Amino acid sequence: MECVKQLCRNHLCLDSLTGPVRSVLTQGTTAEKVQLVVSCLGVVCSIICLALGIAAAAVGVSCSGFAIGLGVIAILLGIVLFAISALDVLEDHGLVGCPFKLPCKSSPANEPTVQFFKGKNGSADKVILVTQ
């Protein structure tokens, strides 16, 4: 259990997620509340259907691999669409960025900068290209 807590603490930004959820529940319109609840239920139901589909395929139900593949793709697409719908509502109430911390951090690109130094008559006397 401690491992799960540590994983959630390290990879979930719950502070940035609970504020928008609370805002939707207290200040959101009925349509936003319904959209958020249905989106969450849709994600959960899609995950359950995905697990049942994989279990049925593992048991050996007489289905073709093509049908199973299409079913898995449809369910995964459902999960993504329901999650996007939920994030859409939360972004209207202050969610900024992804609520998950990515394991690898991207470093900003080191782009060169140009510095202009004016001469006596106002023209560019010296141009220095600075790279970092």
From Swiss-Prot:
InterPro entries for the chain: IncE
Coiled coil regions in record: none
Keywords: Host membrane, Membrane, Secreted, Transmembrane, Transmembrane helix, Virulence
Transmembrane segments: 41-61, 66-86
Protein localization: Secreted; Host vacuole, Host pathogen-containing vacuole, Host pathogen-containing vacuole membrane
Record membrane topology: Multi-pass membrane protein
Any one cellular-component term (Gene Ontology): host cell membrane
One protein family per Pfam: IncE
Major localization class: secreted
Keyword Thylakoid: no
Function: Inclusion membrane protein probably involved in early modification events of the chlamydial inclusion.
This protein's name: Inclusion membrane protein E
Taxonomic source organism: Chlamydia trachomatis serovar D (strain ATCC VR-885 / DSM 19411 / UW-3/Cx)
